Amino acid sequence: MRVIPAIDLKDGQCVRLQKGDYGTAHKVAENPVETAQRFLDAGAELVHMVDLDAAKDGSHANYGVVEQVIRETGATAELGGGIRSMQDVETVLALGVSRVIIGSAAVRDPEFVAEAVKKYGDRIVVGIDAKSETVRTDGWLGDSGENYIAFAERMESIGVRHIIFTDIDKDGMLAGPNFDQLAALRASVSCEIIASGGVSTLADIAGLKKLGIDGAIAGKAVYTGTLDLAKAISEAK
């Protein structure tokens, strides 16, 4: 299992939200490039990046920052937020990003996901963000009404091999992941599952590993010092 540190970008800065609420955004680091470098120095093999501005309104103001992070640190990175078309996928890959995360568009336009997977294979990841077991869209502001497991099974059936599952109620709360939902998801699909939301202790990492989860995204816990990234990476191996 691997631990993947997160950089959430808003107005070019590293921020964190609580439960996906943009009103709670607060800066957690001054410099995204230096932040990514610290993550790499701690042993991270992949950096998870989210463009919060793009997720909310489709603007791409943070793309220059993403490109700079990859160019200056050599980081292997995945990026999500506001990716709604094949043109968006190609634009993001041109930044040097290794994997593209499709979120809301996967709910509305599964044919787009199928096309992206057919062309780019393992470079396509679907982000499933759930609240009370239903999939949310548009920066978590919209409710699709679809059960997260049914949606994951549908994505796997069209060729998706990587899923990031976020329990919105756990996000940014430092209260541990939703092990029950993750166990149910693990029992339902065979593709790679990366857990996001609430990962904050070495015990959380061990618990996810025991469930057979393939990766864990750590955000707020790393910034607050609650979770030592190097130790978490070691625990996951």
Q: What do the PLM-derived regions correspond to, one by one?
A:
Residues 2-6, 46, 74-78, 98-101, ...:
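Structural preference for beta-strand elements that scaffold enzyme active sites
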Residues 3, 54-70, 84-90, 104-125, ...:
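Active-site-adjacent beta->alpha loops and helix N-cap segments on the catalytic face
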Residues 7, 51, 104-105, 128-130, ...:
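Short secondary-structure boundary segments
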Residues 8, 39, 47, 92, ...:
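Conserved, mostly hydrophobic/aromatic
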Residues 11-23, 90, 97-171:
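Conserved anion-binding
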Residues 13-60:
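N-terminal beta-alpha supersecondary unit
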